[in-house]
Every structure is written in C-alpha cells, then in structure tokens.
Amino acid sequence: MARPRSFDEDRALDTAMRTFWANGYESTSTRDLCEVLGLDRSSVYNAFTNKRELFKRALTRYMDATTADQLRILDDHELPAIERIRALFARILRTEAENRRDGHGLGCLTVNTTMELAGRDPEIALMLARDAERRAAGLSAVIRSGQRDGDIGSTRDPAELARFVNAVIAGIRVAAQGGADDATIEAIAATAMDALA
C-alpha cells in the first residue's frame, strides 16, 4: 500500500509556479525546487515525475487562473465592451504594480515562457498557443460586440484587434519586467485604448 502524501500538492504547485515565474525554467534547478517546496528530491520526483512535468503543471495552473480571471472581466455584460477592455488593462496594470520587486515587474509566466521556451519546445509552444487562442477568442467576441454597439470605433477585423490587444498586454508585461515605471505602462495601455476607439 502506497504511503499518503505528506504535503499539500496545490500549495506545492503554487510555490513552484512562483519560483519558475521569478527565475525562469532554465534558471530554476531541481535543488531550488526541493528547497522552496521543503521536499527531498525523491518526493518531488514521486509527486511530479521530473522538473519538466512540474513546470508544465505549474504553467497550466497559472494559465488557467490568469485566463479565467481575464475572461471573467471580459464577460461582465454590465459594462459596455470598451469598458470591459479598459477594465482588463486596469487589471494588468494593477497586477504589474503588485508584482514589482527592486523596480522591476515579474512580468507574466506565460510571456516569460514564450520568450524562453516556445521557440525550442513544441509541446510548451502548443500549450501557450492554446491559451493565447482562448484569450483572443474572448477578446474578439467583446470587440465584435463593441463594434456592433458603436462603442468601439475601429473597423478592423475583431480577431486582428484581439491579437493586437494580446500583443499590447505582452508588451506591457515585458516593459514592466524591464523596469518601466507605472506612467510608462499606463501610457501603453491608454494608447491601445485609443486605437480601439
């Protein structure tokens, strides 16, 4: 009979997620993970198989939570479409402000992973592409609604505008990670909103 796990797997995933988010995949060693999780190597391997599988689970957890939060904002039918997108940018800006350390943001685990791994890891690239498509589909529906209702003036294709908004959000994350101050990233968001109007 297998021994029951003596740790909280959800808490371990959250801790691993924050560690990968702060350090990146390559810069996080199995030893680092054992240390922050308070587990020995065999416990980590028994629970998660290896560092890569732990990373994939942590990334999935991050994407599920982040995308669900963004889609919840976009699904607020109490607000006009343009205000839902403004609320989404406000959430992104607030998250960047909350996750600053030493003048630099942590960015976004999804964006960080795209830059670090997507070009050389097809499985991770597919995970990231599916997540981006979920967010783009939600944005596209809101933009289409806003165009129909007249509160989004741009006549460009909603799918193109959704990809644009996603790219701006990624750019905000990278700028914050590079040390851009609040005024700079707020201006980026405001410029994107102007492009939609």
Model-derived features with residue positions:
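Hydrophobic alpha-helical segments that form the core
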Residues: 106-114, 138, 156-175, 187-195
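Hydrophobic alpha-helical connector segments
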Residues: 72-106, 158-165
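Helix-turn-helix
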Residues: 11, 19-61
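Hydrophobic/aromatic residues within well-ordered alpha-helical segments
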Residues: 51, 58, 62-66, 77, ...
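Amphipathic C-terminal alpha-helical segment
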Residues: 95, 99, 115, 120, ...
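Amphipathic alpha-helical packing segments from all-alpha helical-bundle domains
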Residues: 83-87, 105-106, 120-148, 160
